[in-house]
C-alpha cells in the first residue's frame, strides 16, 4: 500500500471513530481493499470523478457509512443506481447479516461491481445489471436506498413496483427542500446526517408507500 493509501486508511480510522457505531479493523481493511480496487479500475474506466484516496474516504466511504444505523436488521436492501457500489458495497461490508442487491444498468459499472463482490468475498451481495424499472425481484424489498437521486419523485415512480407499504425508501440528499408529489407515497421523516470530516450538509429522506 503506497503512502496515499496509508494516509487514507489513517483518515478512515479517524472518521470511523466519530461514527455512532463501532467499526473494527477487519472492516477498515476490507473498505480499504475496496478503495484500492476502485482506484485500479478508475485508471481505465471512469467510475468516479473523485480519485484522490483521502477525498474518497470522506466523500465515498464515510458519506455511505453514516446511513448504516438507519438500516433495519436482517432485511433485503437494494442500492438503486449503485454506480461504483456506493453506498451498497460499503454498507454490505459493515452489515454482513443483511442481503444487498446492487442495481446498476451501466455495463462497465456492473462488471466492476461483480469483480468487487468477488474479490471482497461479499456473500451477502448480488449484482442486478438492469434498470430498476425493469427489475422484478422474487419478493418485495424491505429497503430501497440511493445516493444518486436527482429527483425524488421520478425515483419513486421508477421503483414503486419494487416495494410495498412495509418497505422504506431511503434517499440521501444534500438539501431537505424537496417535496414528494407522488400520490402513493409520503415522507415519513427527513433526518440530518453528520458525515465525519465533511463540511457539507446531508439529509436522509425516509419515504413510505401509503396503505
Swiss-Prot record:
InterPro entries: rRNA_ssu_MeTfrase_G, SAM-dependent_MTases_sf. Its EC number is 2.1.1.170. One of its GO terms (molecular function) is rRNA (guanine-N7-)-methyltransferase activity. It is an enzyme of class 2 (transferase). S-adenosyl-L-methionine binds at residues 81, 86, 132-133, 147. Gene3D superfamilies: Vaccinia Virus protein VP39. Belongs to the methyltransferase superfamily. RNA methyltransferase RsmG family. This is Ribosomal RNA small subunit methyltransferase G. The gene is rsmG.
Amino acid at each position: 500500500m503506497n503512502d496515499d493509501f496509508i494516509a487514507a486508511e489513517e483518515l478512515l480510522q479517524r472518521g470511523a471513530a466519530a461514527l455512532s457505531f463501532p467499526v473494527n479493523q477487519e472492516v477498515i481493511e476490507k473498505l480499504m481493499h475496496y478503495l484500492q480496487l476502485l482506484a485500479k479500475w478508475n485508471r481505465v474506466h471512469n467510475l468516479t470523478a473523485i480519485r484522490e484516496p483521502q477525498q474518497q474516504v470522506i466523500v465515498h466511504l464515510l458519506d455511505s457509512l453514516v446511513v448504516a444505523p438507519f438500516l433495519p436488521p436482517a432485511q433485503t436492501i437494494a442500492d438503486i443506481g449503485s454506480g461504483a457500489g456506493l453506498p451498497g458495497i460499503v454498507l454490505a461490508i459493515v452489515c454482513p447479516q443483511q442481503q444487498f442487491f446492487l442495481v446498476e444498468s451501466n455495463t462497465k459499472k456492473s462488471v466492476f461491481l461483480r469483480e468487487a463482490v468477488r474479490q471482497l468475498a461479499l456473500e451477502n451481495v448480488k449484482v442486478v445489471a438492469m434498470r430498476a424499472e425493469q427489475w422484478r425481484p422474487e419478493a418485495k424489498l424491505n429497503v430501497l436506498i440511493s445516493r444518486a437521486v436527482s429527483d425524488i419523485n421520478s425515483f419513486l415512480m421508477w421503483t414503486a413496483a419494487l416495494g410495498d407499504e412495509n418497505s422504506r425508501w431511503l434517499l440521501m440528499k444534500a438539501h431537505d427542500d424537496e417535496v414528494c408529489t407522488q400520490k402513493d407515497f409520503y415522507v415519513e421523516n427527513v433526518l440530518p446526517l453528520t458525515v465525519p470530516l465533511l463540511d457539507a450538509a446531508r439529509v436522509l429522506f425516509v419515504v413510505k408507500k401509503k396503505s
